[in-house]
A protein has these predicted regions:
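Conserved mixed alpha/beta catalytic, RNA-binding, or beta-rich assembly cores of soluble enzyme
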Residues: 41-58
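C-terminal functional regions that serve as terminal interaction/effector modules
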Residues: 33-38, 55-203
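Intrinsically disordered, low-complexity linker/loop segments enriched in Gly/Pro
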Residues: 1-28, 32-42
């Protein structure tokens, strides 16, 4: 994605964030630009600070004070359960959890991130590849199916499938399995209740 397109998207949202990935020595080894559900790698560029980000995106100087700029720190560490914290100019911190699992989407390995609005952001995946609406107020339903020994996570909007995410079982941790089980149980409950309502209406 070209930086100009990224800039236009970020300016429409009036927000942007930086993801810093550090090694065990604390050195920044990679950085990403994040806006809503879009995450773009900034490979080959010098380390960018939050103060430099609006200038990089060509935001007019007189409009920069109205922008929401966040910083996300990721600690490589042991590679186990990781947590991210968004630090912003607002009072308090907004937690964002990097779920302890990796997924294979369109032959690309990704990791889902759950933020304060419970929106899953997929690292290294284009927004249109997931086809999940930006409107966090719209209901989402999750269902799980097994295929060739692997688990497929279906993201539903009503009765329409919005995304199919196949998990890489070799990377799934116990915590991730518990998370998937919770989704399965919730999806089953929704289906059961919907079936009861439909049968009641039929009578």
């Amino acid at each position: 994605m070209k930086l100009k397109s990224v800039s236009t998207y970020c300016q429409s949202a009036m927000s942007a964030g930086l993801i810093y990935t550090r090694d065990e020595n604390g050195e920044i080894i990679r950085q990403h630009l994040v806006c809503r559900q879009m995450i773009v790698p900034l490979d080959g560029m010098p380390v960018i600070s939050g103060d430099q980000l609006p200038a990089l995106l060509d935001v007019p100087e007189e409009k920069r004070d109205a922008w929401f700029v966040s910083r996300i720190e990721r600690d490589e560490g042991t590679g186990k359960e990781l947590s991210w914290m968004l630090e912003d100019r607002q009072p308090g911190n907004i937690p964002a959890i990097l779920l302890p699992m990796t997924l294979a989407v369109n032959d690309v390995i990704v990791q889902p991130v759950m933020d304060e609005a419970c929106v899953a952001r997929m690292q290294f995946v284009r927004v249109d590849a997931l086809k999940v609406t930006d409107d966090i107020k719209k209901e989402r339903t999750y269902a799980l199916r097994s295929r060739d020994g692997r688990t497929v996570l279906m993201v539903m909007k009503g009765m329409t499938a919005r995304a199919a995410i196949m998990t890489d079982t070799a990377w799934i941790s116990e915590a991730a399995n518990e998370w998937l089980e919770c989704l399965t149980n919730e999806a089953a409950r929704v289906v059961r209740e919907r079936g009861k309502d439909e049968r009641a209406e039929g009578r």
